[in-house]
A protein has these predicted regions:
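Short, solvent-exposed aromatic-acidic interface loops
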Residues: 88-94, 108, 133-135
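Conserved hydrophobic/aromatic beta-strand scaffold that supports enzyme active sites
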Residues: 47, 69, 106-108
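Extracellular structured ligand-interaction cores
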Residues: 65-69, 83-85, 114, 126-127
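Double-stranded beta-helix
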Residues: 1-14, 118-146
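A short beta-strand-loop-beta hairpin characteristic of the jelly-roll/cupin
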Residues: 71-102, 140-143
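A short, N-terminal "cap"/entry segment at the start of jelly-roll beta-barrel domains
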Residues: 1-60
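Short basic alpha-helical hairpin corresponding to helix-turn-helix/winged-helix-like nucleic-acid-binding
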Residues: 54-57, 61-73
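Conserved metal-binding segment of the jelly-roll/cupin
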Residues: 98-121
Length: 146
């Protein structure tokens, strides 16, 4: 499409299917990342199709930005049942709390809050992880414990 007055506000990115994309641990399924440079601001949005059980983030870590994690089943006739268990640990030491979602839901992680591991268990159908960072032109983390 030719450049027009508003074409700068339309962003097209291909899905990255990769052979198997290994980051810290485990396979992150087909995904697309929209970074601050795409929007010319400090907002990052990542969409990942999770297809198998894995530890997505193995270690506790923090961010200096707010993070939102939405989990949605990719089954059009049942938008409530995730078809898996998704666990996120908040806090560290004696303050650790494990929280588990088995239905459509979201985790909000304010900046500075220690969190992780982030685990997908018993995955029986694909799940969409929508991952947003506000105040961050890209996703990054500072590990707290290994």
């Amino acid at each position: 499409m030719a450049d027009t007055k508003y074409s700068q506000y339309v962003i097209r990115k291909p899905i990255d299917y990769g052979d198997k994309i290994y980051y810290d641990v485990g396979y992150y399924g087909p995904n697309v990342w929209y970074k601050g440079e795409d929007y010319k601001n400090d907002f990052t949005m990542i969409f990942i199709r999770v297809e198998e059980s894995m530890i997505m983030e193995e270690y506790a870590h923090v961010h200096d930005f707010d993070m939102y994690l939405w989990l949605l089943p990719l089954e059009p006739n049942n938008m409530e049942d995730l078809g898996c268990e998704v666990e996120l640990v908040f806090g560290s030491g004696d303050e650790k709390e494990k929280h588990i979602l088995t239905k459509t839901g979201s985790f909000f992680v304010p900046k500075g809050i220690v969190h992780g591991p982030f685990t997908f268990r018993n995955v029986t159908k694909p799940v969409l992880l929508a991952h947003a960072c506000t105040g961050a032109a890209d996703y990054y983390k500072t590990e707290v414990f290994k």
